[in-house]
């Protein structure tokens, strides 16, 4: 390439441990040699989050709001052991949760498929993209142990001072048990619907919403009704123009259908279903190291992309000791490619769009040509059968990707 591609504004968030090392390698070898970016960098490493009382996470989210594109490295969400390890002031919340709460939107997970990496569900030849409504329901519920006989009731007290309404949940007559009150909000469900419809249109794939509205007639029925109303009013004609469709399905039917399908659809899940099914689907495709995660805001304009996996602590401990590691960078690279592809779409930048696509193609072509990290070699041969000659280490693999990207872009005469 004789000159760099103009890329525009991107918010990048550095992370922790092994993924932080890989993140810098991706920028150095695959992004910055070819793309001139107006980078707005935020260090979301655990030490800096602690030093800034987590203000850096909020600042990063506000920057994504402003510039519409964010790419994020995996980060540590501290537990008690991490608080002790880093001598943290407190157990800071998940940065992903903080960013999601500020931006709103829905997290969509998508598998990266290579022909030579076996899938547990062999029929899945196209990705299944799961959108999880990461708000409310069990995750914001009030649950408690009922200590003995008595009534559990839920009361709604209107703000306008009108009559209270009380519902009997259960009359515990012969001893205690457990009870729970949970909720969701129309606004959040509407945002979830818009993000899901936007995602389906951007991929050109059909969309399914799964609920259990036959049992939770009012609660899940509300999800079904809001989706249908928004679809009919705002998206139906756009879907028909792309020859795709939207349907509501019962969750049990949907799970069965997903297993026997070939993939190639968007699956909008309520909070708990999305939590469970996204991991189930990820495993079905073979590897969390090959799973992207994209937060799409209801405006369809603001996007934050990251890898769906963690910081790969075990490899980082080996790296710190000077031992060889073979860490899979693909999902982190795809965070960059998806972010840049969205920047290209917003700016109508065909060169940047070509680059983002070429970067993804290089990743897949390199693996399909037999050059891969140890986790992928284990998917093919089974971990006990993997020999050192079957895989490249972290740095060798990054070099190989860099070499192949350079060749691909030279061929394209950009």
Curated annotation (Swiss-Prot):
Substrate binds at residues 77, 94-100, 109, 132, 212. Coiled coil: none annotated. Its cofactor is Mg(2+); Mn(2+). GO terms for molecular function: identical protein binding; isocitrate dehydrogenase (NADP+) activity; magnesium ion binding; NAD binding; NADP binding; protein homodimerization activity. The modification N-acetylserine is found at residue 2. One of its GO terms (biological process) is female gonad development. It comes from the Eukaryota. Binds 1 Mg(2+) or Mn(2+) ion per subunit. It is an enzyme of class 1 (oxidoreductase). The keyword Oxidoreductase applies. Mn(2+) binds at residues 252, 275, 279. The record marks 139, 212 as: Critical for catalysis. It is found in: Cytoplasm, Cytosol; Peroxisome. The modification Phosphoserine is found at residue 389. GO terms for cellular component: cytosol; mitochondrion; peroxisomal matrix; peroxisome. The N-terminus is blocked. Acetylation at Lys-374 dramatically reduces catalytic activity. NCBIfam families: nadp_idh_euk (TIGR00127), PRK08299.1 (NF006156). Catalyzes the NADP(+)-dependent oxidative decarboxylation of isocitrate (D-threo-isocitrate) to 2-ketoglutarate (2-oxoglutarate), which is required by other enzymes such as the phytanoyl-CoA dioxygenase. Plays a critical role in the generation of NADPH, an important cofactor in many biosynthesis pathways. May act as a corneal epithelial crystallin and may be involved in maintaining corneal epithelial transparency. This is Isocitrate dehydrogenase [NADP] cytoplasmic. The gene is Idh1.
């Amino acid at each position: 390439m004789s000159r760099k591609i103009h890329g525009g504004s991107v918010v990048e968030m550095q992370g922790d441990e092994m993924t932080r090392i890989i993140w810098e390698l991706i920028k150095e070898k695959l992004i910055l040699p070819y793309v001139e970016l107006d980078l707005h960098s935020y260090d979301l490493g655990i030490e800096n989050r602690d030093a800034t009382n987590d203000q850096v996470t909020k600042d990063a989210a506000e920057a994504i709001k402003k510039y519409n594109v964010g790419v994020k490295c995996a980060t540590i969400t501290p537990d008690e052991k991490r608080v002790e390890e880093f001598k943290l002031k407190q157990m800071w919340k998940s940065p992903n949760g903080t960013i999601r709460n500020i931006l709103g939107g829905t997290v969509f997970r998508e598998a990266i498929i290579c022909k030579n990496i076996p899938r547990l569900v062999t029929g899945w030849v196209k990705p299944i993209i799961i959108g999880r409504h990461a708000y409310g329901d069990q995750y914001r519920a009030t649950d408690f142990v009922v200590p003995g006989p008595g009534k559990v009731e839920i009361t709604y007290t209107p703000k306008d001072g009108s009559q209270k309404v009380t519902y009997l949940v259960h009359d515990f007559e012969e001893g205690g048990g457990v009870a729970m009150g949970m909720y969701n909000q129309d606004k959040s469900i509407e945002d979830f619907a818009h993000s899901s419809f936007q995602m389906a249109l951007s991929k050109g794939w059909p969309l399914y919403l799964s609920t259990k509205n036959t049992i939770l007639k009012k609660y899940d029925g509300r999800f079904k009704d809001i989706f249908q109303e928004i679809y009919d009013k705002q998206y139906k004609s756009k879907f028909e123009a792309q020859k795709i469709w939207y349907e509501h399905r019962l969750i049990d039917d949907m799970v069965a259908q997903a297993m026997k399908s070939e993939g190639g659809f968007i699956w909008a899940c309520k909070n708990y279903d999305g939590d469970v099914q996204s991991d189930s689907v990820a495993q079905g495709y073979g590897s969390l190291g090959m799973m992207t995660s994209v937060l799409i805001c209801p405006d369809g304009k603001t996007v934050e992309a990251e890898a769906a996996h963690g910081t790969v602590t075990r490899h980082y401990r080996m790296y710190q000791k000077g031992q060889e590691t073979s860490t899979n960078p693909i999902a982190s690279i795809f965070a960059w490619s998806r972010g840049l592809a969205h920047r290209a779409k917003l700016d109508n930048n065909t060169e940047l769009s070509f680059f983002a696509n070429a970067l993804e193609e290089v990743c897949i072509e390199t693996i399909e040509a037999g050059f891969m990290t140890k986790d992928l070699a284990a998917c093919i041969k089974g971990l006990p059968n993997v020999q050192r000659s079957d895989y490249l280490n972290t740095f060798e693999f990054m070099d190989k990707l860099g070499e192949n990207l350079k060749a691909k872009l030279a061929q394209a005469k950009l």
